[in-house]
Amino acid sequence: MPMTPSEFKNRLLFGSLPRSSSDPTDLQFTEPNVPPSLFSLPEHNDDTATDMAPDQETEQSVSKSIARQALALLVVYLSLGVLIYWLTLDSDNAYQTHPVAVALYFFVVTFCGFLIVHFVVKIGWLDSFCFSVMMVTTVGFGDRAFNTWLGTFLAAVWLLVSTLAVARAFLFLADARADKRNRERAKKVLGESISISQFFAADIDNDGRLSLAEFAIYKLKQMEKITQEDFIQICNQFDKLDRTQSGRITLVDLTTATSV
């Protein structure tokens, strides 16, 4: 249909105008009036699913990362305990605890307080570890305190148990060092030969001969397993039992001593 002069003017000023609904050329392009829900989902559902998928993936990756870090720290902690115990292990001692058992012992002692502080006092993991270590060593942690009765009760029990456990551990270490020193001294004494001066020092009855008892007593003195005072007390007890002064203890002497 040809345009009028006014339509041509409006076309030049405002651009193309939408065709009227009466134009028959529009009928072939008109879509049927069908609800859009029959063919596609609403647009906001796609956006919501798109937004939730990355969040779920992020949370899963973070949880997996935390689990891996916790497992790695546990392995490192136990490995360090086993390594330290293994380096200080004395091969001469026949009665030794398995290194893994010792590492687990120290792990349980420190980790129990670590969990109590974290879940009861509600502080961070690193602060919980420092707090538990300071509680065990009775140093204290002035910046934090237990505000609930449950936390105070658990802290009281944990302080008592952990302090005794650490004291027992230090006692074990001191005994181990003393035993190691004694074994080294005994090994050195037994590896030495006796000199002339030592011969006269070991000859208790001064008869110019060393009996097995005299030699054993002298070696025990050198190993510091028996002192001169201990030897004197043993001799006094022997003299009390040897009533006949024969240098030997008989059954008659024992019977007389028992009846008295």
Curated annotation (Swiss-Prot):
Expressed in hydathodes and the vascular tissues of roots, stems, leaves and flowers. The keyword Repeat applies. Residues 190-225, 229-256 form the EF-hand domain. Residues 18-31 have a biased composition (Polar residues). The pore-forming region (also called P-domain or P-loop) is enclosed by two transmembrane segments (1P/2TM) and contains a pseudo GYGD signature motif such as GYFD which seems to be involved in potassium selectivity. It is a multi-pass membrane protein. This is Potassium inward rectifier (Kir)-like channel 3. It comes from Arabidopsis thaliana (Mouse-ear cress).
